[in-house]
């Protein structure tokens, strides 16, 4: 590698660090002193380098002239004594996003065991170029599905922090249905593409008939996709339906039926992006 190329690469690295520290100062300036902000920046850079939460490896990767043992003690003190404001973390992540809003959001829940403790987290993530970037979360003191109130609280936190205009649409799986939840999204006019079960009862406004969701799409063959042109009631809320026939994890063909606020013709391609949040969960689970 020639000298000019090396200088250019170093300059780019310096610029990235400058942007990082400037953003940290802007977001955390009222909550942290300068020394702690610099430490936090080193900590984030080390996390990106080693991609592990092992304190010893992180301390050894600090871009600093301080001894590893000293860096390790700083990490331990920081983790033990400092309570991070998750809203500030969300603002920090949001400020570093490489493109401008509106964003596609994915809502999902992940759970696992840490020793004998059940971990159950409701997560809202921004989907970007094949990645799901967690932006807000709620630790749920229970095992099982989230409630409508917990989902609404999480969405309201996002809206209060970043504004409803930064939302392109919301993607979610079959767990995230319910009349009050859909009513909230419709009232806020938040575009959504949410999967529903095949056996959901659907009410057709123009003739008053009630049918199963699968009735609209029973003719589909494997890998075919179709959307229903008319508006319908799902759980008492007006929305549009679309579906594709896919193979599930066991290789059995099934209907993937999606309820949408509008533009059901886009639901199939957009819903695929929801899988990024499940991939993110898989990578972040403890070994």
Predicted feature residues:
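Single, function-defining residue in the core of a domain
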Residues: 2-52, 64, 89, 100-103, ...
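Residues at alpha-helix boundaries and short interhelical turns
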Residues: 52, 66-69, 83
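Short alpha-helical "recognition helix" segments of helix-turn-helix
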Residues: 58
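Short acidic/histidine-centered micro-motifs embedded in hydrophobic/aromatic stretches
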Residues: 61, 78, 287
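Short, basic interhelical loop/turn and adjoining N-cap
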Residues: 61-74
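Active-site-proximal, Lys/Arg-enriched surface segment
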Residues: 72-129
């Amino acid at each position: 590698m020639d000298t000019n190329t090396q200088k250019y690469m170093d300059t780019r690295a310096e610029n990235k660090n400058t942007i990082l520290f400037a953003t940290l100062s802007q977001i955390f300036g009222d909550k942290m002193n300068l020394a702690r902000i610099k430490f936090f920046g080193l900590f984030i850079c080390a996390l990106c380098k080693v991609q592990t939460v092992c304190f010893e490896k992180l301390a050894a990767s600090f871009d600093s002239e301080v001894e590893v043992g000293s860096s390790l003690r700083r990490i331990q003190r920081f983790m033990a004594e400092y309570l991070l404001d998750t809203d500030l973390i969300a603002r920090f992540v949001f400020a570093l996003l490489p493109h401008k809003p509106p964003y596609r959001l994915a809502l999902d829940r992940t759970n696992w065991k840490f020793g004998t403790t059940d971990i159950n987290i409701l997560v809202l993530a921004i989907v970007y170029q094949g990645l799901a970037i967690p932006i807000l979360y709620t630790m749920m003191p229970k095992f099982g599905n989230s409630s409508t109130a917990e989902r609404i609280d999480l969405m309201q936190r996002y809206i209060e922090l970043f504004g409803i205009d930064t939302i392109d649409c919301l993607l979610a799986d079959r767990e995230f249905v319910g009349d009050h939840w859909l009513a909230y999204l419709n009232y806020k006019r938040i575009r959504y593409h949410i999967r529903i079960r095949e056996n959901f009862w659907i009410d057709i406004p123009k003739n008053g008939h009630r049918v199963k969701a699968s009735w609209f799409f029973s003719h589909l063959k494997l890998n075919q996709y179709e959307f229903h042109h008319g508006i319908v009631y799902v759980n008492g809320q007006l929305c549009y339906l679309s579906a594709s026939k896919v193979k599930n994890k066991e290789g059995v063909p099934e209907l993937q039926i999606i309820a949408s606020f509008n533009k059901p013709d886009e639901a199939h391609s957009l819903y695929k992006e929801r899988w990024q949040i499940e991939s993110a969960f898989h990578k972040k689970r403890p070994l």
